[in-house]
Amino acid sequence: MTNGTKVLKRDGQTEGLNLEKIHKMTEEACEGLAGVSASQVEIQSGIQFYDGVTTAEIQEILVRSASDLIDLDAPNYQFVAARLLLFGLYKQVFGDWKKGFPSVRDHLVSGSEKKIYDPTLESKYSDDEWSKINSWVDHNRDLTFTYAGLRQVVDKYLVQDRSTSEVYESPQFMYMLISAAIFAEYPQETRLDYIKRYYDAISKHKINIPTPIMA
C-alpha cells in the first residue's frame, strides 16, 4: 500500500511511499522485544515524511523515531532503534542483504579493489583457513547492540568515506578482519585459535578494542 508521498530511491527513480514495507521493517525491528510497539514507531515517524524524501532519510527518520521513544519505562526501544539503524547499514553495504551475506574473504577482496583494505591480507591465509574464518562470523551478534553502542561504532569506527558518509563494512566483518589482521603473522598452528577467541571476545563485547586499532 502506498500513499501520495513520493520517495527518491538510491538509483534515482521515484516511487510512492510504501507503508506496508515500512510496517514490515518496524515489525521486524520489534520482534521478540517486550514493551515496544511497531505502531508507536510508525506514528512517531509518519508526520516527518515529505515529497522527495530519500530511502536513506526514511531509514534515519525511523531510527530517530524509535530512539525518541527510549525511556525508563520502555528501555527496549534502544534495541529497536539499533536494529533499524542496522537494517539501513546492511542495505548500504550489502544491497539486498536478505538474500545472504558475502563471505568475509569476498568482502575483503571487494574492499581491497576499492582500496579500503590492505590487499595483502587475503594472501596470508589459505583457502581452508578462510573457510574456517568465515564459518565463525555470526551476524546475529549485531542484534545485541544498543542504539548508543551501534551509533558509536557506525559513526566512529566502521570503514567509510567521510565526505559522503558511505559505509563499507558491517560490525561483524570489522571485528573479524581486525582479528585476521592482528594474528596474520602468528604461527599457522595457533593463529586460527587466536583469531576465533579474539573475535568471540570483541564481537560479544566482552572486551573493548583500543581506539587506534578500530580506527
Task: Give the ranges of each region predicted by the language model.
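Extended catalytic cores of very large enzyme megasubunits
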Residues: 1-215
